[in-house]
Amino acid sequence: MPIDSGLSRRHILRILAGGAALAAGARPSEAGEARIGRLIGEAKTLPTIAQRIDFISGALRGTTYQGYTLIGGPRRPEQFVVRDDAFDCVTFCETVLAAARARDTAEFETALREIRYRNGIVNWFERNHYFFEWGQHNVANKTCRWIGMDGAVDMEKMVDSQKGLSKRRFAMRVIPSAIFLAHKAVLQSGDIVGFVSRRANLDYFHAGFIAFARDRTLLLRHASESRRRVLDERMDRFLAAYRVRYVTLLRAEQPAAAVAVKKAI
């Protein structure tokens, strides 16, 4: 079967607001531009979205970690940026999820816009800045669903760590880490795990995908700031190293039909 790798520079880096050229640091490599298109073509033969997420995220291991790759601000026009040569933890999750939902690069771009922004509107104030809102938004648009476990508890957070946004009050249902590790059997490769912050004014400090080693050891597949790349590491060790008390889980929904390709806003 021929592989779709037609991801041109203009297509993958279309600027949807402002009209200015992207900064040089926001450009992917030429090899990176072709990589997402190739992975979409290979992954679309897999029957479930969990398998596609596992395949695509695994293929991106080794990619560089880089924070602050998105462009925009309260007083700066938002630009729709796609990076497949560098990720932070959230752009890694949303790029993989969009690619897993797509059958070609046009669907990928649409899916990524719908995942990153409320109603797919490319505007800084519509971007899902807090990961709890990212989850809420992507449950509402049927991209994901929340996964609970017996023993989960309620938590309320008042967050204000993002400059330019008003305070938000989040009522969260969170899973204690010990319960999470004890219920490995209910997890699937490709589930999205969010790590709840110990800070009072922040919802999460990190996110990544569930993965499994061949011996079924539970792994975290993520864009690691400390290790500066996308990698797998043992979940129990990550939880211990960062003294994680609570997590939340999202599971990607199987797309009911092709992602509708919308005209850029």
Explain the meaning of each model-derived region.
Residues 28-166, 170:
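N-terminal capping segments
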Residues 198-202, 226-228:
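Solvent-exposed loop/turn segments at secondary-structure junctions
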Residues 201-221:
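Catalytic nucleophile-His microenvironment captured as a short glycine-rich beta-strand/loop
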Residues 156-198:
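A mid-sequence, solvent-exposed acidic-amphipathic segment
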Residues 217-227, 236-265:
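Low-complexity, Gly/Ser/Thr/Pro-rich intrinsically disordered linker/tail segments
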